[in-house]
């Protein structure tokens, strides 16, 4: 990632990397919030809700900030939305975001050995499916 692509905000006690690509589509982007001055307890990968047809990671900056204040790294991922795509694309995007996080988060100061999935509403469904149904992660090893 180039310096121009990396935005760090240190005055608030955390670093923020915006719009990191986790896949080929324009909405395959995530923001990474990392606590400053200490290693994170774990990396929390969060998927927001919005009935799979609305939402953006920027609306959940408050969550990224709150998690870093508590010693966690937060990864908040955008994913493709309806009507541009239909189910199961939402869960497939979540699986891709998790696979990227597992493979790459150490380079961003995170814990690939301690990833916690979290979500709200439709995003909670995405997180739950990754946790209980192995078919979503199977294509990613």
Residues covered by each model-derived region:
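N-terminal cap/lid segment of alpha/beta-hydrolase-fold proteins
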Residues: 1-38
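Short beta-strand element of the alpha/beta-hydrolase
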Residues: 40-50
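Loop/turn elements at helix/coil->beta-strand transitions in domains of secreted/extracellular proteins
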Residues: 41-42, 72, 113-114
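Short beta-to-alpha linker loops that shape the active-site pocket of alpha/beta-hydrolase fold enzymes
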Residues: 50, 73, 78-82
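Short N-terminal helix/helix-N-cap motif within the alpha/beta-hydrolase-1
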Residues: 54-61, 84-85
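Short amphipathic alpha-helix adjacent to the substrate-entry channel of hydrolases
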Residues: 58-76
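Helix-loop module immediately N-terminal to the HCX5R catalytic loop
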Residues: 91
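Primarily recognizes the serine-hydrolase "nucleophile elbow" in alpha/beta-hydrolase
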Residues: 96-141
């Amino acid at each position: 990632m180039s310096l121009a692509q990396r935005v760090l905000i240190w005055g608030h006690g955390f670093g923020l990397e915006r719009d990191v690509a986790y896949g080929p589509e324009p909405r395959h982007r995530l923001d990474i919030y990392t606590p400053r001055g200490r290693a994170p307890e774990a990396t929390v990968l969060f998927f927001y809700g919005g009935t799979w047809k609305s939402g953006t990671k920027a609306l959940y900056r408050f969550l990224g900030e709150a998690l870093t204040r508590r010693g966690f790294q937060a990864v908040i991922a955008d994913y493709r939305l309806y009507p541009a795509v239909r189910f199961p694309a939402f869960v497939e995007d979540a699986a891709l975001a998790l696979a990227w996080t597992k493979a790459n988060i150490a380079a961003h100061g995170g814990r690939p050995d301690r990833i916690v999935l979290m979500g709200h509403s439709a995003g909670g469904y995405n997180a739950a499916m990754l946790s209980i149904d192995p078919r979503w992660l199977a294509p990613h090893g």
